[in-house]
A protein has these predicted regions:
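Extracytoplasmic metal-acquisition and chelation regions
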Residues: 1-171
Length: 171
């Protein structure tokens, strides 16, 4: 391969290791937007990451295969036109969702909610435990349950791929 694409933010360190012995240019999505190791790794939900990564992939292919430079530029332009439609819908929706509180059992949708200008109302203790991949305390779980029962949360994000006995107590 001449170009390899990874997530970054310590989500897929194996990808970096696999690309190192090759001559492939590694494009790491997180790095294109300045997202560092330890930050939220669910970067593909970020408009900035998608756009920056598309441009970085295009540049990598243009460098690896300069005879098709114009073709890659055309494909990038076509992709951006579609992405712009999505971004327009997100911007339109954000006018309605700005400031609305949401809560999440884990941070998978954080970047999307941020683009929608929503407010993360996930109880801090629970959010910190989830981010550190540790168990929340019984008090954290109760705080989350109470937050949901209070009725002010407008969107609840549950990642079924991360379901466990703790999330069962909340959902």
């Amino acid at each position: 391969a001449k170009v390899a694409v990874g997530n970054g933010a310590d989500y897929d360190p194996w990808a970096t290791k696999a690309a190192q012995p090759t001559k492939a240019t590694l494009v790491t999505a997180a790095e294109t937007a300045g997202i560092k190791e330890g930050d939220n790794p669910h970067v593909w939900f970020s408009a900035k990451v998608r756009s920056n990564t598309a441009d970085a992939i295009t540049a990598a292919y243009q460098k690896a295969d300069p005879s098709h430079k114009d073709d890659y530029a055309k494909l990038n332009k076509e992709w951006h036109a579609k992405e712009d439609q999505l971004e327009s819908k997100i911007k339109e929706t954000s006018a309605k969702t700005e400031g609305l509180p949401y809560a999440a059992t884990e941070s998978v949708a954080w970047y999307l909610a941020d683009d929608l200008k929503m407010t993360d109302a996930t109880p801090k203790g629970y959010a910190q435990a989830s981010a550190n991949e540790s168990e929340p305390t019984p008090a954290d779980i109760k705080d989350f349950q109470d937050t949901l029962k209070a009725g002010f949360i407008k969107m609840f994000v549950f990642n079924s791929q991360e379901a466990n006995s703790t999330t069962d107590q909340i959902t």
